[in-house]
Amino acid sequence: VCETFEVPYIHIGTDEVAFTNPEFVPEMVAYVRSKGKKVISWNPGWRYQPGEIDMTQLWSFRGKAQPGIPAVDSRFHYLNHFDTFGDIVALYNSRIYNQESGSEDIAGVILAVWNDRLVPDEKELISENHFYPNMLAMAERAWRGGGFQYFDGHGVILPEEDTPEFKAFADFEERMLWLKKHIFQGYPFAYVRQTNVKWKITEAFPNGGDLTRSFPPEQEWADVYYYEGRPYQVKEARGAGIYLRHVWGTLVPAFYPQPKENHTAYAYTWVYSPKTQEVGMWIEFQNYGRSEMDLPPLAGKWDYKGSRIWLNEQEVLPPQWTANHREKSNEIALGNENCVVRRPVLVVLQKGWNKVFMKLPVGRFSTDEVRLVKWMFTAVFVTPDGGEAVEGLIYSPDKIR
């Protein structure tokens, strides 16, 4: 390896293993150094003292930088788990290792694309992991420093419009979309504007494990609902993709501070169109991780949670899934489960206001079919080819133009 790769560093691992020989890791570090290379190792992993290793890579939330040992932060940076619209918010707004700038102890950052599951080609690898948008977000943060808190601070939800965090992300989004149009034309770049997309989302109603149970929002929209003697509030959210509960649970804050299993939420908005037009729609209720063996949805269903969506009172049905296997295997590639690798669902927007309504149940947060359930939704109108957002639309749950 040292002879083949003309690089200054060699990574020797040391994570997720039970150490039985206390001399093995120091011996391997010395051996690699004898070949003229510097050595990187995982943290958590082997416990080093300054001088015993040249750099550590922090791979989980338990990873901690040590004074005297340069560290690279890759905690929460696993693109193979990222969705299209939520995780990039946390990625851009977060400080690297929660520090304003680099130092002798904080060397930089790494984004990981760890597809344990078979990938058919490079284009799908880049598309499903939203590679270019996330790289641009991380590159700006790495070069310029700064940011706001960390992944476990504000999380994956866009903050209020008048906050510095929102203004910074909206500015970045504007510049990123310019790069998409002028620099990345022809490349798989799965992102459209989302800072203009507004929703109202209810508090979650307890469904007792019945994912089909109906609740008051299915009868009428209101600012507060009453069910079984208690009020259920409604709160506004922004974004084309909203995590109600993140894939890593409460480690990364999402819409609900303390989400619970066996609950049902509702999200809705009005969308103003200046004309009647056929458009595409990205719709997704379980963004499939690229390192999981999760099973594809059953025919005619969006997911295993019972998620449903209506446009102007007409239910929007899922596409025909290209994967229908019932055997879990990392050697079976994903089909068209994720919205960015399939043609958008074609729908018609009427001139004027259009009603979008979603029912979002959840049962267990880990099931036989899906190990890491993402309680979430993605819904945004795009051109029929999925290349751009539809121009001239206004997303407003209060019908404000």
Question: Can you describe what each PLM-predicted range is?
Answer:
Residues 17-21, 46-50, 63-65, 79-82, ...:
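Flexible loop/turn segments at secondary-structure boundaries
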Residues 275-301:
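A short beta-strand element within beta-rich, extracytoplasmic domains
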Residues 259-273, 341-343:
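Short beta-strands within extracellular/lumenal beta-sheet-rich domains
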Residues 60-196:
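Flexible, acidic glycine-rich loops studded with aromatic residues
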Residues 113, 273, 285-287, 360-362:
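Short beta-strand segments enriched in hydrophobic/aromatic residues
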Residues 1-55, 61-64:
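Active-site neighborhood of glycoside hydrolase catalytic domains
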Residues 170-260, 290, 321, 355, ...:
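Accessory carbohydrate-binding/adhesion or oligomerization-edge regions at the termini
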Residues 294-296, 300-377:
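Beta-strand-rich ligand-recognition modules
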